[in-house]
């Protein structure tokens, strides 16, 4: 009775407003009826899609005659579902980690070594994969930041002050000393390139450095290198560290470029040098990056990519680093070394599947170079660091670096260290912005 009354009321309303019918062509009641029909058809289509999907998951021999007829009547749905299945399988295969057998890897490394020797201007591009050996998680690996977030799990990391430059970091520094590498373009914020002894003029840390804070009120900007993670209180779009400039008293800020932000600082980002290196390079050795947009991906030229696991997607694009305006004959060759698929595989002259440290060890052996060992006593961060002023000791709670592991760091005051995981201010910040949180009931 209620529905009939509603219909009569709708008809009366439609008759009372002929202007509306003339203007729109349909009465309000007719539009509502058409909308109900549309929704009903959509629900029927979804239910049919679910039925077809359940049938396709069965073995052919297990399908009934009625189910066979339903599939025959739903060719479009079958084609769509089979296409979805192929795409899912393709994505799974791309996420799988594949290793070349030892003999094949050595053969490929010999070819890579030849490319390094013959390069006129070699630029190294690095991502999170080169730091996994230092117990710093990557982003897309099995235990990476993005992977854990997608599973709804929390992100944690070991105390980053315990991280030290890896074999790959030290190999890059050696290659630069031997004038085989001209510049390093890095997406990493962990400061391990700086601590490996690589000159600051020879690197561009495009996403910042966790050990550096700056005063943007001073001209030029005044840098403060610290022996602790300065990002404890910072986050996406919130960069003040809580300390002040020794000269002008303005608030200091970190140098981290989070996902969705655009880096504007001169140093340590050093974009000018990165762009110049990209335009001059004929070879790029890329370690630890997925080369997936919208990450920094490769810098315009030959990319020799040694990547264990992919890196975060912090900024959307770096088109001016690609130099794709050059004719194909002038573009550099592409060499990729990665355990996983990358979107640049088809462009590569050679694809190697291997871990960064493993490949770099073989490469340095092939080049006849000895890999220097990292020493905290020779870590340049201690000579570059600006000590905290009196009264600033309590401005952070992160463990400070020290030359000896037994020596208490500056500002630690001998306080006992917590065994709980420590999460750096920059690590994972901005990643959680787009994750869905489960409602607590």
At which residue positions do the language-model features occur?
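Conserved catalytic core of sirtuin-type NAD+-dependent deacylases
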Residues: 2-441
């Amino acid at each position: 009775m209620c529905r009939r009354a509603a219909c009569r009321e709708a008809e009366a309303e439609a008759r009372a407003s002929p202007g509306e019918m003339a203007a729109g062509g349909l009465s309000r009641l007719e539009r509502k009826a058409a909308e109900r029909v549309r929704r009903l058809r959509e629900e029927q289509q979804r239910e049919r899609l679910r039925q077809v999907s359940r049938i396709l998951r069965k073995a052919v021999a297990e399908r009934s005659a009625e189910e066979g007829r339903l599939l025959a009547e739903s060719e479009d749905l079958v084609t769509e579902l089979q296409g979805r299945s192929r795409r899912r399988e393709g994505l799974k295969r791309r996420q799988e980690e594949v290793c070349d057998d030892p003999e094949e890897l050595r053969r490929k490394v010999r070819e890579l070594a030849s490319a390094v020797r013959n390069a006129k201007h070699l630029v190294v591009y690095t991502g999170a994969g080169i730091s996994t050996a230092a117990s710093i998680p990557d982003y897309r690996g099995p235990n990476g930041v993005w992977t854990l977030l997608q599973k709804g799990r929390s992100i944690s990391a070991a105390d980053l002050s315990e991280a030290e430059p890896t074999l790959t970091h030290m190999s890059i520094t050696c290659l630069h000393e031997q004038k085989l590498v001209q510049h390093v373009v890095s997406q990493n914020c962990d400061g391990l390139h700086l601590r490996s002894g690589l000159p600051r003029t020879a690197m561009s840390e495009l996403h910042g450095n966790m050990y550096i804070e700056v005063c943007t009120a001073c001209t030029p900007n005044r840098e403060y290198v610290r022996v602790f993670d300065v990002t404890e209180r910072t986050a996406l779009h919130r960069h003040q560290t809580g300390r002040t400039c020794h000269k002008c008293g303005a608030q200091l800020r970190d140098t981290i470029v989070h996902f969705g932000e655009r880096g504007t600082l001169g140093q340590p980002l050093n974009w000018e040098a990165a762009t110049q290196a990209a335009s001059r390079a004929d070879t790029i050795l890329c370690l630890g990056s997925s080369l997936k947009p919208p990450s920094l991906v490769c810098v315009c030229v030959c990319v020799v990519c040694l990547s264990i696991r992919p890196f975060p997607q912090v900024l959307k694009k770096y088109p001016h680093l690609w130099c794709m305006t050059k004719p194909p004959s002038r573009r550099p060759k592409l060499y990729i070394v990665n355990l996983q698929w990358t979107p640049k595989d088809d462009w590569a002259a050679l694809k190697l599947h291997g871990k960064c440290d493993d490949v770099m060890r073989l490469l340095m052996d092939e080049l006849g170079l000895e890999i220097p060992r990292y020493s905290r006593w020779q870590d340049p961060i201690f000579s570059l660091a600006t000590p905290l002023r009196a009264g600033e000791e309590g401005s952070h709670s992160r463990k400070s670096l020290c030359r000896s592991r037994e020596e208490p760091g500056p500002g630690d005051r001998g306080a006992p260290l917590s065994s709980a995981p420590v999460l750096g201010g920059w690590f994972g910040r901005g990643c959680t912005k787009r994750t869905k949180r489960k409602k607590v009931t």
